[in-house]
């Protein structure tokens, strides 16, 4: 199935044509999602988590030209991506996340430590966008918590798929718990800027929220 989607260019529906994608508008993308969902809901979850909230979406909006050039063409060709925000014990309040990214002493990057739960596509993802606490900043005399977003290669040492999460309906999705232990992230993989990760995540999720009803309505119609 994944190879078939790749032949159709489905992994790059939302990726601009200049990077090898199909460059679909939101309307046409949701039409395609509505078609696929009448056949397989789990397949829609793979496609949607990859490009509605996975690495392509935040890179399109906030990535540097270098980040876009490095990753978007690869993602359009079938390298699967995912979005890592939620944590055990945090749930729907991502501002309370405990995963941390600490600057390295040599200034070349960050060391990531923590856990992320409900990471859809994490089972097969090559690249993810992950949010983590970075050192706080003092604003108007008060310490302000910082959350930043990073691009992470899943084959980096220290990344562990702890277990696959099970679901009652979408039994074919690859949703997992990921653990990070001193995972090195190069400094150039910071997306948008320090302290902007939570805002990036919430903006990115708006696209996913649009895609869900785009799939649910056709699925309901098909069942009727």
What is the predicted function of each stretch?
Residues 77-85:
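A short, Trp-centered hydrophobic/proline-enriched beta-strand micro-motif
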């Amino acid at each position: 199935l994944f190879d078939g989607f790749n032949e159709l260019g489905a992994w790059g529906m939302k990726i601009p044509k200049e990077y090898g994608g199909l460059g679909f508008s939101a309307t046409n993308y949701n039409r395609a999602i509505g078609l696929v969902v009448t056949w397989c809901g789990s397949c829609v979850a793979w496609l949607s988590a990859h490009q509605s909230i996975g690495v392509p979406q935040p890179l399109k909006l906030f990535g540097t030209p270098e980040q876009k050039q490095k990753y978007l063409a690869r993602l359009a060709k079938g390298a699967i991506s995912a979005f890592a925000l939620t944590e055990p014990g945090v749930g729907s309040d991502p501002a309370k996340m405990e995963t941390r990214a600490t600057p390295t002493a040599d200034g070349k990057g960050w060391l990531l430590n923590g856990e992320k739960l409900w990471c859809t596509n994490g089972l097969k993802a090559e690249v993810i966008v992950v949010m983590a606490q970075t050192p706080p900043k003092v604003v108007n005399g008060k310490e302000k918590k910082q959350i930043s977003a990073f691009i992470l290669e899943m084959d980096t040492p220290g990344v562990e798929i702890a277990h696959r999460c099970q679901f009652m309906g979408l039994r074919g999705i690859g949703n997992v718990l990921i653990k990070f232990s001193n995972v090195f992230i190069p400094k150039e993989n910071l997306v948008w800027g320090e302290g902007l990760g939570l805002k990036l995540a919430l903006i990115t999720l708006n696209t996913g929220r649009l895609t869900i009803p785009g799939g649910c309505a056709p699925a309901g119609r098909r069942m009727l």
